[in-house]
Amino acid sequence: MSLNVVILAAGKGTRMRSDLPKVLHPIAHKSMVQHVIDTANSLGSQAIQLVYGYGADKLQASLGEQQVNWVLQAEQLGTGHAVAQANANINDDDTVLILYGDVPLIQQSTLNALLDARTHDGMAILTVDLPNPSGYGRIVRIDGKVVGIIEQKDANEEQLQITEVNTGIMAVPGKQLKVWLSRLSNSNAQAEYYLTDIVAMAHEDGVAIDTAQPQSAIEVEGANNRVQLALLERAYQTRAAEKLMLEGANLRDPARIDIRGEVTVGMDVMIDINVIFQGKVVLGNNVTIGAGAILIDCEIADNAEIKPYTIVEGAKLGQAASAGPFARLRPGAELKEDAHIGNFVEIKKSVLGVGSKAGHLAYIGDAQIGAGVNIGAGTITCNYDGANKHLTVIEDGVFVGSDTQLVAPVTIGKNATLGAGSTICKDVAENELVITRVKQRHIQGWQRPIKQKK
C-alpha cells in the first residue's frame, strides 16, 4: 500500500483578522502548513494532496516548488467536501492520511503510531482525552468499540459528558474512503459535509476502527486566532529548548530562547538569554553564546565564543575564535582558529586568519587576511567602486594602524606595517612601513569662528 497524505488548507481563518491565509501564519519562522508538509514528507509518503481555497496566489507563492498536488476547494462546504476534492488523486489501494494545515505541531512518531494502529483494510483515528472537551466532536463507543463521532452542536446531554474527542486526523483505506465520501449528507446543524460521519459508516460496514493518541494534547491543537497561534509558538519553543538541553546545551533560561530552524549542539554548550537561532546552525563543544545574539545558517567550532548582541549570518567561526560584543558577521565571513573581532566590527565575504584580530570599529569586506594580523580601530577595506567589488589581500603578520583605508584591489605583503591614518591605494611589499598622512601643520593664535546670535 502507498501512503497518500491529504492536507486540508482551504480555510480563510477569519478570526486571525488578517489578509494572510490562516495556514501561512508562522510558527518558528515557518508557516503552519509548511510544518505539516515537512512532517508528511518525513513519513515517506508517496503523494501529498494540498487542498486549498482562500488566498491561492499567496499560498502558491509561499510554498513555491513543493512536491504536492494542488487541489482546489472552490467552496468551503465542510471537511468531508474538502477531502472529496482529492478523490481523483486517490488510488483504491492507498492508505490515506488526513492532516490539517493549521495543526503544525503533530509529530512524526504520533502519526507512525496511528498508521501502525490501523489493521488491514481498517481505519484508525487519532483521539485525545481532554478535561474540558467543549467545542470538540466526541468519540462515541459501545462496549469499548468506536461506533461514531458526534459534533458538539449535534450532541445530546449524555454525549456532551464524553471527554475523548476527535482530532480530525485519521488513516483510511482509499477505496472505502471514496465510497463513504459519496454517501455524506449535510443534514446537520452546520449544513456541512462532516468528514467525521465516515466513522459511523465504517462501523455500519463492519470495518475495524482503531485509535491512537498523541503523547501530548498540544500536538493536535489548531490555531484559529492569534492568541492560539502564540500558544502554539510557545509550545514549539519549549519543546525545541528541551531537545537542546537533552543534547548537551546549557540554557540560562529555556523560556527565553527562539529556535527558528535546525540547531545541532555539541557538549557543554552555554546559551544565554534572548538568543535567536534561524536556519541551520551547528555549535561545537564548549561553545558560548552571549545574550541577545542572533545566529543564522552558521557553523561555530569547538570553544568558540559569540559575545552578547552579535549577529552571525552565513558565516563560520573556527576553534576558539570569538566575535563581539555588538559585532556582525555577514554571509561568506570566516574567522579561523583563535581569530577575534570585537565590538562594532562588520565582516563580509572575508577570511580572518589564525590568531588575527580586529578589535573594534572596522569594516572588512571582500578580503583575504592571513595569520597574526592586527586590524586597527577604524580600518575600512574600500571594496566597492560604485559598480564592482574588489579584493583586498593582507598577508601574514601585517600591522594595520587605526583609521586606515585600503582601496581595493590591493595587496599588503607579509609583516608590513601601515601607519595610522593612511589611505593605501597601491600594493605594499613585505616588511615595509607605509605612511600616507599629510604633513602636520601648527597655526599659532588660531581663532575658531564665533556663532552669530540671531
Curated annotation (Swiss-Prot):
Any one GO cellular component localisation term in the record: cytoplasm
Segments carrying the region annotation (Linker) are: 227-247
What is the superkingdom listed in this entry's lineage?
A: Bacteria
Region described as N-acetyltransferase: spans on this chain: 248-454
Which residue intervals make up region (Pyrophosphorylase)? 1-226
Q: Which reaction does it catalyse?
A: alpha-D-glucosamine 1-phosphate + acetyl-CoA = N-acetyl-alpha-D-glucosamine 1-phosphate + CoA + H(+); N-acetyl-alpha-D-glucosamine 1-phosphate + UTP + H(+) = UDP-N-acetyl-alpha-D-glucosamine + diphosphate
User: How and how many cofactors are bound, per the record note?
Assistant: Binds 1 Mg(2+) ion per subunit.
Quote the function comment for this protein. Answer: Catalyzes the last two sequential reactions in the de novo biosynthetic pathway for UDP-N-acetylglucosamine (UDP-GlcNAc). The C-terminal domain catalyzes the transfer of acetyl group from acetyl coenzyme A to glucosamine-1-phosphate (GlcN-1-P) to produce N-acetylglucosamine-1-phosphate (GlcNAc-1-P), which is converted into UDP-GlcNAc by the transfer of uridine 5-monophosphate (from uridine 5-triphosphate), a reaction catalyzed by the N-terminal domain.
Locate the residues binding acetyl-CoA.
A377, N383, Y384, S402, A420, R437
Description of how the protein assembles with itself and partners? Homotrimer.
Protein name per UniProt: Bifunctional protein GlmU
Annotated keywords = Acyltransferase, Cell shape, Cell wall biogenesis/degradation, Cytoplasm, Magnesium, Metal-binding, Multifunctional enzyme, Nucleotidyltransferase, Peptidoglycan synthesis, Repeat, Transferase
The entry lists its GO molecular-function terms as:
glucosamine-1-phosphate N-acetyltransferase activity; magnesium ion binding; UDP-N-acetylglucosamine diphosphorylase activity
Q: Where in the cell is it found?
A: Cytoplasm
Provide the GO biological process annotations: cell morphogenesis; cell wall organization; lipid A biosynthetic process; peptidoglycan biosynthetic process; regulation of cell shape; UDP-N-acetylglucosamine biosynthetic process
Give a yes or no for keyword Transmembrane in this entry: no
- UniProt-annotated binding residues for Mg(2+): D102, N224
Q: Quick one: which gene encodes this?
A: glmU
Name the positions where UDP-N-acetyl-alpha-D-glucosamine binds: 8-11, 22, 73, 78-79, 100-102, 137, 151, 166, 224, 330, 348, 363, 374
Which biological pathway? Answer: Nucleotide-sugar biosynthesis; UDP-N-acetyl-alpha-D-glucosamine biosynthesis; N-acetyl-alpha-D-glucosamine 1-phosphate from alpha-D-glucosamine 6-phosphate (route II): step 2/2; Nucleotide-sugar biosynthesis; UDP-N-acetyl-alpha-D-glucosamine biosynthesis; UDP-N-acetyl-alpha-D-glucosamine from N-acetyl-alpha-D-glucosamine 1-phosphate: step 1/1; Bacterial outer membrane biogenesis; LPS lipid A biosynthesis
Q: Which residues form the active site?
A: H360 (proton acceptor)
What is its cofactor? Answer: Mg(2+)
EC number(s) given by UniProt? 2.7.7.23, 2.3.1.157
Please name the top-level EC class of this enzyme.
transferase
Family, according to the entry, reads as follows: In the N-terminal section; belongs to the N-acetylglucosamine-1-phosphate uridyltransferase family.
